[in-house]
């Protein structure tokens, strides 16, 4: 059979097989076009689950008369014009296929008016007929698209549609997901002329919480942990299901630059953070990640449900650290009086409730940050050290004035209060072992501690008598980590499997090194194998999670190949590598105050005296 170009009608119907899967796919494409057009209100009318009628009405910028026919053509778009535009996409649409594909399998009417036009115009296209008829019409500024008799000319596709109720449920579920991230938009949804959903714009915190409860349920909203973290070009905001809420939920929404996607990296990061509290089920979350569009490729899936991150491991660990921080700040789990005196539940003097005793002197953003130094040194990199809270409050998409806070100060839901005593006791035991490994040796009877103010996220300002000095945070962090590693190393460190094992070229000598130092590596929580001349790094202790493993592990093997390191040397090496991990300033100060006097004095010996008396004399 000879090779020939496909007719435009057939090409559009083939493309429709990828773009238009069901009525919900049509709604998704058309609503996203409305949002790209700057609409602040979108009305969605559905008849018979979308198989009979889908009408989308918006108040966006509209389409000019001369562009109406072109808008229904394949690969016609106003959103990208150059390759550079394609590599930095912030709009929902960019391929120019949706309208052409939809019009090829339905009877489509597009009515639109721009602010510059004195009258509206209407374009009509039907199925395989590629001719577009443009006629005058009456319409306010914006656009209305009617899709009638979906799949009328493709009976095989129409037979695969489910019941009207099922198809409408898919539309309703998709609208919920977009209504969360676009809390500034007024959405309405009607089915068979009956108003089903109305999401009013959320311009205040209370309205935002109301929309969250409307979409995710009151139980989720009442107990959810709010999260807002920023590091370099990454900003993560949203909500996490509280560990106190044991109700299994399907609220797993993740957005990248406002686009709803599915990504296993996110599920793994959230689940790993919760697993450190002993919570094995998949927790609910609504997370919105904003980053440089050059760092993510959205043009990898026909329906744009997936993206490809240029630094997927970096994104995973950023989300992991942000969720860990949210759980650290989580209020202590409320226990009944009977359970508080249960023999199996120890008093919970953990980081979570000790945080209530900390008085923060400096209210600047730097209270929530730790900057561990230059990014040039691998062992000193603070990969997420400058994570802080954006100061501007702008609904779900914006920042928050506190790093992590409960959404509501209300009583736990009935589902939470109905937990069995055994389950609550187990939670209490889990909370007794704080999420952050470095807090495990904090004294049970910790006194009230006032954290000194931070300077540039790198020093604490210490005022004692008439002396003013700067205490380097990095030296304190190193001392705390050494103490933590020393405490745990004797019994062996816990291994954490990598989401994606790291593979590097292996030296011939490493086989013997792994055999000779096998016990040492196991004690350090490191699992390595060699296959096909490749060293595969499978598991590492928490202290190495943020390291450049492809560099650090070979250096370790070279070191232990030449000598048998002492325990103190291993402690120092692991502590040094762990400096790249994020640690909240308040938690670190608590840990520092719990160190023995000798270790504290060693840290204080590194402080820098500020000659403030001389400055006063000079002035």
Swiss-Prot record:
UniProt KW DNA damage keyword: yes
Gene3D superfamilies: 3.30.230.10, Histidine kinase-like ATPase, C-terminal domain, MutL, C-terminal domain, regulatory subdomain
Record carries keyword DNA repair: yes
Entry's Gene Ontology molecular function annotations: ATP binding; ATP hydrolysis activity; ATP-dependent DNA damage sensor activity; mismatched DNA binding
Gene Ontology cellular component terms for the protein in this record: mismatch repair complex
NCBIfam families, per the entry: mutl, PRK00095.1-1
Function: This protein is involved in the repair of mismatches in DNA. It is required for dam-dependent methyl-directed DNA mismatch repair. May act as a 'molecular matchmaker', a protein that promotes the formation of a stable complex between two or more DNA-binding proteins in an ATP-dependent manner without itself being part of a final effector complex.
HAMAP family recorded: DNA_mis_repair (MF_00149)
Record-given protein name: DNA mismatch repair protein MutL
Organism: Shewanella frigidimarina (strain NCIMB 400)
Species lineage: Bacteria, Pseudomonadati, Pseudomonadota, Gammaproteobacteria, Alteromonadales
Gene: mutL
